[in-house]
Amino acid sequence: MQLSNYHSHCTFCDGRSIPEDFVRFAITHGFRAYGFSSHSPLPFETFWNMSKDDMPEYLQEINRLKQKYSDQLEIYAGLEIDYLDETYNASIPYFQELPLDYRIGSIHFLPVSERLVEENMVCIDGSFREYAHSVERHFEGDVRLLVKRFFDTTMKMIEAGGIDIVGHMDKIYMNGQKYEIFNFEEDWYRKPFEAFLDLVPEKGLMVEVNTKNWTKKKELYPRVEYLSRMREMNIPVMVNSDCHYPDLVNDGRKEAFKLLKQAGFKSTRELVKGKWQDIAL
């Protein structure tokens, strides 16, 4: 089993420990590679995103750790970058000019107005109460409309480019599945998801298998049921824990690798000495 993790949050965003604590855990548990992917700056403040002012220090600290632990662990500097709209996403010069090893593209917010401020954002990754309030207020009480907006926006993110990895690709279902009407097999969910999935290999992207909620909810993003389809499409994958605490770095990894093997995967995509390679499971 390949011990690596490329989706990780530290105290530069909403993580609960300093970067070095994650590095020490990774080394102690035999990891070969470890990547940091703090939540990128946004055009508005949130409690979980890094500020632009902190970016130089973030990059400096990750580079310091790279040098300090170079004989024990491959350490990489990444970002998890939100797609908001065509004016603010991973493809804009600010993010492309940063000296990063990789970029994860994710959807946490869906704008409901052209003005990119927090009050105009629907957060899909928070509490169900907040999610349900947004469905009522902005989507006529119909979760299907929110799902459509999510996948439409995800398609735009992929078309915009500037990313290497698609993060928690279907996390819209985390809260959405609590609605009685929610059905993964009906066309309103299945068709936009499959259209999005078809676009991933066309753009040459990797997809993470996100294990953040495996221990608590037995959920992966993408859903376990989609892994076989992704294998048939030759979509390269990696297993990431999306951890915010050092002791959760390895959460769900063993189970995810078992599920990947059952789905027919023979390898995962990994950074080896700075280059993406397929490593046998």
Residue ranges with predicted function:
Residues Y34-F36, R103, V166, V207, ...:
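Hydrophobic residues within beta-strands of alpha/beta enzymes
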Residues S37, S106, M169, N210, ...:
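Conserved residues at the C-terminal ends of beta-strands
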Residues H9, Y131-G141, K275-L281:
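A generic hydrophobic-segment detector
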Residues M55-E202:
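Extended substrate/RNA-proximal surfaces in nucleic-acid metabolism proteins
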Residues D187-V249:
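Active-site-adjacent C-terminal substructures of enzyme catalytic domains
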Residues M1-D85, N89-E97, D101, Y173-D187, ...:
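An N-terminally biased module of ancient metal coordination in phosphate/nucleic-acid-related enzymes
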Residues D152-M155, A160-G161, E225, F257-A263, ...:
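C-terminal functional module detector
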